[in-house]
Amino acid sequence: MLENLSTEHRNEKTMNLDEMNIKEVLQSMNEEDRTVALAVEKEIEHIEKVVRVVIQSFEEEGRLIYIGAGTSGRLGILDAVECPPTFGTDDKMVQGFIAGGLKAFTKAVEGAEDREELAEEDLKSIGLNEKDTVIGIAASGRTPYVIGGLKYANSVGASTASISCNKNAEISKYAKLNVEVETGAEILTGSTRLKAGTAQKLVLNMISTASMIGVGKVYKNLMVDVQSTNEKLVERSKRIIVEATGVSYEVAAEHYEKAERNVKAAIVMVLLQCEYGEALEKLKVAKGFVKKAL
């Protein structure tokens, strides 16, 4: 029942929300938002377990699949689409599904979140298998679309995890690993796009970033698998080579082009004073980890 969910309770601090001036509303929101990171902190051990499972999937050439409805689904897609430019992944490695399909990203599709079978259809469409990890996201922790997806994922032997913003969430029963970030009542009653959505975004940031570090997509604190898809990222790539090696911008740019715009290879070429082919071979042996290649 909705009334039993803490995310649906009325916030005692904002009973007069409609009487506040603009600054008071903003201060109230900011005050509530400060509690979110602390709520996430309490779940770090559970998030760590999820990351380990995702890394294992990646090492076995499996995928990370997010499923959710409404804001939760949009946040999963947002995290997924940022992985290729940030970490050089292909667009299949991390994917997001939203109840009602991609059109639901910009406009609500009535009733889609209430149909368990839609998630099964979505996961079947990508050939979900036992190497993959499916993470179901639902602020309420009770969305049928997410439950249906987790049920199907379990049936094919995939790893499963859930992210919710209520304790003892319904979706936790259907996932092998659970993250329950208790964000409590929103300033606007039931509007879980606020604190709950912020918490979900923080957790997704943690999962994708830590997992990519775990498979060699980062050297020191540099995103060395960045894809140079625009001028800003081309410049960032050259700056990463400068930061990683200490050479001048000009030398970094030269090696960047010699390495066919492969930042990792350029770094190895500079630091080991080797040719492009040798750098690639060292990275292959090191399974993509720059530090190991060096």
UniProtKB/Swiss-Prot annotation:
Pathway named in the protein's UniProt entry: Amino-sugar metabolism; N-acetylmuramate degradation
Keywords: Carbohydrate metabolism, Lyase
A single MF term (Gene Ontology): ether hydrolase activity
Recorded catalytic activity of this chain's protein: N-acetyl-D-muramate 6-phosphate + H2O = N-acetyl-D-glucosamine 6-phosphate + (R)-lactate
Domain SIS: 54-217
InterPro entries reported for this sequence: Etherase_MurQ (IPR005488), Glucokinase_regulatory_CS (IPR005486), MURQ/GCKR (IPR040190), SIS_dom (IPR001347), SIS_dom_sf (IPR046348)
Biological processes annotated in GO: amino sugar catabolic process; N-acetylmuramic acid catabolic process; peptidoglycan turnover
Protein's UniProt keywords contain Lyase: yes
PROSITE patterns xrefs: GCKR (PS01272), SIS (PS51464)
Active site (record annotation): E82 (proton donor), E113
Keyword Lyase: yes
EC number: 4.2.1.126
Family the UniProt entry places it in: Belongs to the GCKR-like family. MurNAc-6-P etherase subfamily.
Additional free-text comment from the UniProt record: A lyase-type mechanism (elimination/hydration) is suggested for the cleavage of the lactyl ether bond of MurNAc 6-phosphate, with the formation of an alpha,beta-unsaturated aldehyde intermediate with (E)-stereochemistry, followed by the syn addition of water to give product.
Subunit structure: Homodimer.
Role description: Specifically catalyzes the cleavage of the D-lactyl ether substituent of MurNAc 6-phosphate, producing GlcNAc 6-phosphate and D-lactate.
Protein name: N-acetylmuramic acid 6-phosphate etherase
Gene: murQ
